[in-house]
């Protein structure tokens, strides 16, 4: 119901299709791609934003964030024509570039995502296809961990805001703008990159 409501809200600015698939279940990522290709007449761009957010559960994190992501991407590549407009974008995380306690599984699979896309970018370049990662930092949105912290844990919220050079957190729209740029022909010579959208939070680190 929530997905249908969101799709209806978004449809005011264009055509929106919605579909439910479990990226951790074998066959479902490919099935989703088949459905999407049928609905839209093919696949030119795929954005993989899947994440189990499974805490310390390595098995679940790998099943969704790595194996599910790879299945989604590989199925999409089979539907892509060989031309410069096609590209793959995976949503990574600043966590792949920094050390933080209690997120080893999440950070590990996001680091693996960056490495996988660098490799993929070399595999598909001759087809004219690009592959990149967009890695958000701390992003605030309704229902998210930082949205809850702002409401319920003032000390944690103040600390996380002070850690960012801009003294604020990012928004989903700021991440989406970067994804839209990477998906467009304006970034036609960008591939194999990991673009951080973190307000400079990692700028003082050697990575």
Which residues does each predicted region cover?
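Short, small/polar-rich loop/turn modules that mediate ligand/substrate recognition or access, typified
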Residues: 125, 130, 190-192
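Short C-terminal tail/terminal secondary-structure segment
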Residues: 180, 191-207
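Residue(s) in the substrate-gating loop at a strand-loop-helix junction
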Residues: 93
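Substrate-binding pocket helix/loop in short-chain dehydrogenase/reductase
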Residues: 57-62, 160
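Alpha-helical segment proximal to the catalytic Tyr-Lys
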Residues: 78, 122-123, 188
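A glycine/serine/threonine-rich, flexible loop-to-helix segment
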Residues: 126, 136-163, 204-207
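Active-site helix of classical SDR
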Residues: 73, 109, 117
């Amino acid at each position: 119901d929530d997905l249908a409501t969101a799709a209806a809200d978004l449809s005011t600015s264009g055509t929106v299709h919605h579909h439910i698939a479990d990226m951790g279940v074998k066959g479902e990522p490919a099935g989703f791609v088949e459905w999407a290709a049928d609905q839209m007449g093919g696949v030119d761009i795929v954005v993989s934003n899947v994440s189990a957010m499974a805490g310390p559960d390595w098995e679940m994190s790998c099943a969704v964030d790595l194996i599910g992501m790879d299945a989604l991407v590989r199925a999409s590549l089979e539907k892509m024509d060989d031309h410069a407009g096609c590209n793959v974008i995976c949503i990574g995380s600043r966590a792949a570039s920094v050390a933080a306690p209690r997120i080893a599984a999440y950070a590990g699979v996001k680091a693996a995502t960056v490495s996988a896309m660098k490799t993929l970018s070399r595999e598909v370049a001759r087809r004219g296809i690009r592959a990149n990662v967009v890695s958000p930092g701390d992003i605030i949105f309704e229902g998210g961990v930082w949205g809850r912290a702002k409401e319920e844990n003032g000390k944690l919220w103040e600390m996380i805001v002070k850690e960012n050079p801009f003294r604020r957190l990012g928004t989903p729209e700021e991440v989406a703008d970067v994804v839209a740029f990477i998906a467009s022909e304006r970034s036609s010579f960008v591939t194999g990159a990991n673009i951080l959208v973190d307000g400079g939070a990692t700028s003082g680190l050697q990575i």
